[in-house]
Amino acid sequence: MKTAAQIRELFLRFFEEKAHRRVPSSSLVPQNDPTLLFTNAGMNQFKDVFTGREKRDYSRATTAQKCVRAGGKHNDLENVGFTARHHTFFEMLGNFSFGDYFKKEAIAWAWELVTSERWLAISKERLAATVFAGEGTLPWDEEAYRLWEAQGVPPERIHKLGAKDNFWAMGDTGPCGPCSELHFFQGNDIPCAEEKAGRTCQGVACDCDRWLEIWNLVFMQFERGADGGLTPLPKPSIDTGAGLERMAAVVQGKRSNYDIDAFQSIIRAIEKLAGKRYGATDADDDVSMRVIADHARATTFLVGDGVLPANEGRGYVLRRIMRRAIRHGKRLGLERPFLADVCEAVMEEMGGAYPETRENRAFIVKVAGQEEESFRRTLDKGLAILETEMRKAIPPETHLGKPATPPPSAPRPVIDGKLAFQLYDTFGFPLDLTRVIAAERGFDVDEQGFDRNMAEQRARSEWKGSGEQAVGDLHKQIASELGETRFLGYEAPTARAEVKALLANGARAAKAARGDKVEVVTAATPFYGESGGQVGDQGSIAAPGGRVRVEDTRRPVPGLVTHVGVVEEGELAVGDLVELAVDDRRRDLIRANHSATHLLQLALRETLGDHVKQAGSIVAPDYLRFDFSHFQPLSEEELNAIERRVNELVRENAETETAVLKLEDARQSGAMMIFGEKYGDVVRVVRLGPSKELCGGTHVRRTGDIAFFKIGSEESIAAGVRRIVAYTGPQAIELSQREADELRRAAALFKAGAFEVAQKIEQTQKRVKDLERALDEAKGKIASAQSGDLAAQARDVKGAKVLAVRVQGDGKSLRELADKLRDRLGTGVVALGAEQDGKAILLVAVTKDLTARLKAGELVKEAAKLVGGSGGGKPDLAQAGGSDPAGLEKALAKVQELAVAALG
């Protein structure tokens, strides 16, 4: 039996023999494409090649591409585990032609690879093809039909389908074209919903799995703009996609993707953890194992590509995937963290094809473990919220000391749909879990309200691109017309160039006048456009009849540089020969910070370990910011070591070396790369002493030009990601001086030398603690004296004492007094109320022998409503606060009333 790994290799080798370049998978985080949430097709990394905006040194390519469909338009999340085919993560095998071959070769090679005994050896008799039937002004694809006939496919197995099935587009915009699919017949014994409804199975067009699509050949001929219009591509091209999991299922004779070897190895790891067998008798267990296997794959690869759990964007989708897996783990009875272990099984299965997963193993395992621990705590909070809301829905006297259940004679209360959705969205509760818990307690759930909130959330979370700098059609048009802007800024801060295009006040224009907000495009420029974390340059453009103040420099589409600013004098026109001048003093500050960022990354890896990976950066003139993977705060010793190491490298004054190399040569040289970054075939390598990185930014001539490096702050910004903000040169000196000034000021206040300040602070802290201890002792004596008097006021209820009284003091003194009173009462309930700083304080204590009948937390919650507040706590001790101290007497009376009712 051919394994999935062997099928992947056969596919790639087949096309290598057809003169295709084997190109590595791109990151799951799309580069330079704000229209995509995740990479979801093999052609994503070639989008600009298809549109002619990017050139490669090859015209044929083949890939095995990592893909995720779990958010935005392409969202398979909720189906995963319940069907044989749906996945969040999958591999897309593909071959591509960039204006080279077209339909004839694509169809012939697809047929050869699928049917040849040398390759995949799938039975010809079980294959069918589809072609575009035509729609609107687009004609049917007769050429593809004839080409399938030429391969020996009988006419009755070549089907014409409409645009819904046979016109492919990556998204709302971008490359598209008619397509032709290969389908594999699995058998008429597979159930069909159409037949169950008394209709006829639709064959290759049916949603049942009798005919399984295994390969889609897209004949890339158009680009769809934001207005929906189709523009012919410069050269017709080919984009094909074959899901590895589906192809492996067919080759291995499996009906479900989850039965192929690549999934079964992961499922075996889950079986071992759960002590259960996949495919035994419990269908729900099988669903959960499939969910966990799929979601562990998505987790492994998304985290490996730098996506981290978060509350928005890509991180939010990852968090939902991980939490869905964890929920299904609990369904399997996995009470201890397990997701990291399953991710290890994924890396074992797939690390050979994707070595980056093994390289990032420690990072992936740590993120998975931390998120699971966090979510398990969150899940418990969700259950507590649900319990609280159910208690609110029924009279408190019916549930004190026991789960909230309405009386049998009462109408069934309803859990609000908004709450049910909050539990789903925030705490990971699927609706069916809320429904089951509710039904056990005699509650119903407002499912229509849940659906309404779900629809609103989907509308909010729909991926609309990455913001105001999303690619615009005008920039695309200009880039298509003019090609790449030559960058001259490595050599000099000034240059002469012709104005090739102009945007004035957001519209394309031939000229611009004083006061106009403009984007100026020139044939070449010394200005660096914002990229790689380095901010764009500022400066000026001098024209024969005017002057532009350049406030920013951007790269709105790959290769195109625009100078953003305002016409300060006269006017500017397309065709003008202009003088471009970068603000070189500002550029020098940026150079120093950028070079320091490289040295900082080196020092971090030397000090903390090779798990440190760049997760983001900003290089500005006045500071640098560097985000990196690490799982705990840096100690003072580590921060000092990092700072010392960078300054050592600065003092070495090593000369900066740059080289332009082929990507593979750069990789072999050991140059640091940002994993997931999209690099061209030729890259620039920057060497600063022992630091060597791929980088297109501007740098100092020697490390000594950085002058001085100073860390300003270090903090956490996400699970497993830390952030350092640092300064160089004048800003670093200024920060050091400010710190020294503050130290001198503190020394003066303590009447001590600068190096004695820490000792003086420790001595002061000790004195404060001693005074607090003495104060507590005094309060304790007062409480003891008070408790004797107050205990006498307690009401006897069938052998238990109930005391509800207003006193003076803060929260701490109330707790001490309550402890004394409980000891004196023996068995009973104590409720104390006090006013402090215009606020109400309530405290309820219940002796241990009564907590089965009375819960302090429930009593204090009811009382808190009467002082305009809320609270909670343990069964034996709880506290609340409120904004209305005038209600204290009523609140204390309420506690006494509830306690007497429960005890009586």
UniProtKB/Swiss-Prot annotation:
**Which EC main class describes this enzyme?**
ligase
Listed PANTHER family:
ALANINE--TRNA LIGASE, CYTOPLASMIC, ALANYL-TRNA SYNTHETASE
**List of residues binding Zn(2+):** 594, 598, 695, 699
**What does its UniProt record remark on the domains?**
Consists of three domains; the N-terminal catalytic domain, the editing domain and the C-terminal C-Ala domain. The editing domain removes incorrectly charged amino acids, while the C-Ala domain, along with tRNA(Ala), serves as a bridge to cooperatively bring together the editing and aminoacylation centers thus stimulating deacylation of misacylated tRNAs.
Q: What functional role does this protein have?
A: Catalyzes the attachment of alanine to tRNA(Ala) in a two-step reaction: alanine is first activated by ATP to form Ala-AMP and then transferred to the acceptor end of tRNA(Ala). Also edits incorrectly charged Ser-tRNA(Ala) and Gly-tRNA(Ala) via its editing domain.
Record's protein name: Alanine--tRNA ligase
Q: Which organism is it from?
A: Anaeromyxobacter sp. (strain Fw109-5)
Q: Which Gene3D superfamilies match?
A: 2.40.30.130, 3.10.310.40, 3.30.54.20, 6.10.250.550, Bira Bifunctional Protein, Domain 2, Threonyl-trna Synthetase, Chain A, domain 2
Q: What is the first-listed, main subcellular location in coarse terms? A: cytoplasm
